[in-house]
Amino acid sequence: MVTMRADEISNIIRERIEQYNREVKVVNTGTVLQVGDGIARIHGLDEVMAGELVEFEEGTIGIALNLESNNVGVVLMGDGLMIQEGSSVKATGRIAQIPVSEAYLGRVINALAKPIDGRGEISAYESRLIESPAPGIISRRSVYEPLQTGLIAIDSMIPIGRGQRELIIGDRQTGKTAVATDTILNQKGQNVICVYVAIGQKASSVAQVVTTFQERGAMEYTIVVAEMADSPATLQYLAPYTGAALAEYFMYRERHTSIIYDDPSKQAQAYRQMSLLLRRPPGREAYPGDVFYLHSRLLERAAKLSSRLGEGSMTALPIVETQSGDVSAYIPTNVISITDGQIFLSADLFNAGIRPAINVGISVSRVGSAAQIKAMKQVAGKSKLELAQFAELEAFAQFASDLDKATQNQLARGQRLRELLKQSQSAPLTVEEQIVTIYTGANGYLDSLEIGQVKKFLVQLRTYLKTNKPQFQEIISSTRTFTEQAEALLKEIIQEQIELFLLQEQT
């Protein structure tokens, strides 16, 4: 029989007492009262904060949005099919945040920053809050550098600057996403990080955009955040903030970023769905009262940072779909009032074969020529006014039978100016090529050509300049001004090429 000595027993007990670590952990818990339609009502959670993450027994995460006297309204970040009435819920003490790093470049992720492209996990050692405050007035400086889109109509007449917020607005199927994707393609070699946020889009549309980026080598500097049409409303609501957090990570590291939200009206619809299910009082078009704040707090995060903060920038291009050209609806007017201008795409122009279908008359950039290089200002200064006058004259000319020579010439010039603004999709032009194109049209060199010949001639002219006269491009890129030397060189080349082109066309 084994004998136990009393001193051994007391030593063991003493050791155990010394090892005992008295740790009191207070967990704020509650009970599920009701669950369904992506919403759960919880009893308890007395000390939960607005916007705090809560965790359900089976692992689903939710956000506490409604704090009422006898229950808490939680929106679920998942389907929540396994949540049962009476199961427990605990508050985490955290608010929504995502991991951030350079490794996200070239990846397709969801609103929780989890990869959905099947290429494995993304390593990240830092995290950022999904909702973080926008830079204040002292942290900003005015926009002064151009963000070239590669589209003549925009860069010459509705210029976008780094740190600006420019709305792209129009009916469905008018080429809004094409304008945005062309802008991303044009950032190749410009040291600009791009984020494309797809909210409530068809999976096929997002796949098409990603394929375009991969084929054109744009994925290496682009992050795609996608929440499809079948995603829970909570994730569609969070996706733009996730994209903004990723863009901010680079902006505060003294980098230039551009973010496209496609489109915030789908985010507003998801938020409306959540709000109505939470029984918040509906307002205009059944949207909740704070739908303006939903978009303003997102778009205000776009900024050009001050020199003290490293002069990084975040340019926002939200895309809003209108119904039969009605820009006075609730969400379009909200976003118009928040942004620094809008690019209006017209279904009539699109159907008339003018693509990109930008209505130059009612499109505006509130930053203006501050977002253009000097050379572009010199060449394109009057073209917006000329096109507006031409559109007015064209409408008037439909009723007039006999027009004087000056009016006929003005109409002919306007038609050629409109023709040179046409551009194929995914074919952005460099700023030097745009200057050549606009100068040729604005100075009447295209007047001797038929309208059908304009595009062919301009392609030929740009190709000739690129291969045979690289010095023109060098002058513009080094001085950023349209010097007398550059003008003389260009005049000579245009005259020579027009004569050659007309001879070729005759034979």
Swiss-Prot record:
Keyword Repeat: no
UniProt-listed InterPro entries: ATP_synth_asu-like_sf, ATP_synth_asu_C, ATP_synth_asu_C_sf, ATP_synth_F1_a_nt-bd_dom, ATP_synth_F1_asu, ATPase_a/bsu_AS, ATPase_F1/V1/A1_a/bsu_N, ATPase_F1/V1/A1_a/bsu_N_sf
Quaternary data: F-type ATPases have 2 components, CF(1) - the catalytic core - and CF(0) - the membrane proton channel. CF(1) has five subunits: alpha(3), beta(3), gamma(1), delta(1), epsilon(1). CF(0) has four main subunits: a, b, b' and c.
Name recorded for this polypeptide: ATP synthase subunit alpha, chloroplastic
EC number, as in UniProt: 7.1.2.2
GO cellular component terms listed in the entry, alphabetical order: chloroplast thylakoid membrane; proton-transporting ATP synthase complex
Enzymatic class: translocase
Location (main, coarse): plastid
GO MF annotation, one: proton-transporting ATP synthase activity, rotational mechanism
Topology in membrane: Peripheral membrane protein
Function according to Swiss-Prot or TrEMBL: Produces ATP from ADP in the presence of a proton gradient across the membrane. The alpha chain is a regulatory subunit.
Family note: Belongs to the ATPase alpha/beta chains family.
Organism annotation: Chloranthus spicatus
Listed SUPFAM superfamilies: C-terminal domain of alpha and beta subunits of F1 ATP synthase, N-terminal domain of alpha and beta subunits of F1 ATP synthase, P-loop containing nucleoside triphosphate hydrolases
Amino-acid positions noted as binding ATP in the UniProt annotation, renumbered to this chain: 170-177
Subcellular location: Plastid, Chloroplast thylakoid membrane
Catalytic activity: ATP + H2O + 4 H(+)(in) = ADP + phosphate + 5 H(+)(out)
PANTHER family reported for this sequence: ATP SYNTHASE SUBUNIT ALPHA, MITOCHONDRIAL
Residues with site note (Required for activity): 363
Keyword vocabulary terms for this entry: ATP synthesis, ATP-binding, CF(1), Chloroplast, Hydrogen ion transport, Ion transport, Membrane, Nucleotide-binding, Plastid, Thylakoid, Translocase, Transport
